[in-house]
Structure formats: structure tokens, C-alpha cells
Amino acid sequence: MVTNKGCTALTWAVDKGLEKVCEILIPNMSEQAINHVNNNGSTALTLAAWKGLEKICRLLIPKMSPQAINHVTNNGNTALTLAAWKGLEKICELLIPKMSSQAINQVTNNGDTALTLAAWKGLEKICEMLIPKMSEQAINQVTNNGNTALTLAADKSLEKICEMLIPKMSKQAINHMAL
């Protein structure tokens, strides 16, 4: 059952942070309901990542279809970009192997990638997982705030990440000056 706002009981429960309700709902919901996209372009998984609900993300990921795992919200986010933004390292680790190249390289409406967000949050292990999977264009991405993954990694003193990024970046991106 879907409300006139396009929500299921699960998306409402996730949105309200009702973890125990989600734990009961998830095993009892159909595949269609678990993968449902609401009127705001969010799935239960993207909402859970946005809310920082690690336990709910862990329950949802194995139940989600590949299409839902790779879903892009109306704001250009994926579950991966939202998990990186919230610093959910373990969720990023679960998502990366399940995601398509296109979804891993997704640029949000704010000009961020999962890599820039992981660097901003200081998630060194996630950066290490992402760099080999990202396109040159995504690695060189400049956010709407004027940062690259390299400037963000340098700011967080992530020396190993800087060393991994530099050989994969264009000279222009390496010489980019953050705003």
C-alpha cells in the first residue's frame, strides 16, 4: 500500500527513524515494496543512508534489487553518496561491490561524488576502495564548493589517499585551487 505521497509503511518508518518498526517490516515486505521509490525520488535505502541509520541500511542492502541499489534520487544522490556523507563506512563497504560503475561515478546536484564525500569525512578505507573503481572524470570532479577529492584529502591529512589520487588526476585538477 502506497500513500498519496508515494510512501510505503517502510519509507515512513525510515523517514521517522523508527528502527524497531523497520526491523519488523523489512522481512515481511514484498520485493516491490522494499524497492519502491517515493514521490521525492527516494528508496528506503537512500532514506536510511541520509538519516544515518546504519542498522536499517544493513538490513535493506541484501533485500534490494540491483536497480534499487543503484537508484539516483531527485538530488542526484545514491545510497553510496549519502552513506559517505553521513560517514557510514561499513555501509559504503557493503554498497561498493554491489554498485554499477555509473552509480559509483554519480555526481550529485552539489557536484559531489562518493569519493569527494568520503575524503571530506576522512574515510580513508572508502577512498581506497573507490579510487580504482572511479573514472578519471569523477576523480577530477570539482564540487560546487570548489573542492576536489585531492584538496579534501590533503585537508584531512590523508597522505595515502593523496598518493593514490595524484597519478590518476589530470594536471589541471592537481593544480586546482580550492575556494
Swiss-Prot record:
A single GO CC term for this protein reads: cytoplasm
- Answer yes or no on keyword Repeat: yes
Name the Pfam families for this protein: Ank_2 (PF12796)
Q: Does the keyword Repeat apply?
A: yes
Where does each ANK repeat begin and end?
5-34, 40-72, 75-104, 110-139, 145-174
Q: Which UniProt keywords apply?
A: ANK repeat, Repeat
Q: Which PANTHER family match?
A: ANKYRIN REPEAT AND KH DOMAIN-CONTAINING 1, MASK PROTEIN
Q: What is this protein called?
A: Putative ankyrin repeat protein RF_0922
Recorded source organism is: Rickettsia felis (strain ATCC VR-1525 / URRWXCal2)
Write the lineage as a comma-separated list.
Bacteria, Pseudomonadati, Pseudomonadota, Alphaproteobacteria, Rickettsiales
